[in-house]
């Protein structure tokens, strides 16, 4: 089998196509979650904690050279070691929200699967010869 035909067989398998669809939907879903976090959740969190933008929260771990502005971008550009925990907070909130949304989706999908579960199939009638043998057996058992 040639490499091209093997690749074609691999690429058109159902699992690969399902994976591709999942990746595309996941990318679009990521944008939705980013919007939910940035436009809905973070303003509420900012209202509670008094700050909307957590990305500029940091702790300076070294000495700041003279003439360097005391903001995260300039400190990083100057090579000052900083512990930028604000970006981590934002990413952690994104993760928790994404995990919760995926959990709720999976829960609903499982619920739908249970309600739409196929009824057990009716038992298949035994072949005619088996049915005939059973009748003979039953007639022989009678007194």
From Swiss-Prot:
It is found in: Cell inner membrane. InterPro entries: Mechanosensitive_channel_CS (IPR019823), MS_channel (IPR001185), MSC/AndL (IPR037673), MscL_channel (IPR036019). SUPFAM superfamilies: Gated mechanosensitive channel (SSF81330). It is a multi-pass membrane protein. GO terms for cellular component: plasma membrane. Pfam families: MscL. The chain crosses the membrane at residues 21-41, 44-64, 86-106. Keywords: Cell inner membrane, Cell membrane, Ion channel, Ion transport, Membrane, Transmembrane, Transmembrane helix, Transport. GO terms for molecular function: mechanosensitive monoatomic ion channel activity. Channel that opens in response to stretch forces in the membrane lipid bilayer. May participate in the regulation of osmotic pressure changes within the cell. Belongs to the MscL family. Homopentamer. This is Large-conductance mechanosensitive channel. It comes from Variovorax paradoxus (strain S110). The gene is mscL.
């Amino acid at each position: 089998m040639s490499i091209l035909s093997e690749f074609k067989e691999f690429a058109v398998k159902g699992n690969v196509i399902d994976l591709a669809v999942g990746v595309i939907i996941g990318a679009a879903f990521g944008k939705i979650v980013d919007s939910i976090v940035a436009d809905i959740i973070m303003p509420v969190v900012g209202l509670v904690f008094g700050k909307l933008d957590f990305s500029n929260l940091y702790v300076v771990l070294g000495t700041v050279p003279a003439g360097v502005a005391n903001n995260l971008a300039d400190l990083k550009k100057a090579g000052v070691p900083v512990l930028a925990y604000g970006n981590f907070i934002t990413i952690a909130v994104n993760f928790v929200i994404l995990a919760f949304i995926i959990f709720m989706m999976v829960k609903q999908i499982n619920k739908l699967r249970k309600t739409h579960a196929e009824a057990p199939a009716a038992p298949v009638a035994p072949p005619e010869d088996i049915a005939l043998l059973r009748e003979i057996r039953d007639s022989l058992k009678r007194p």
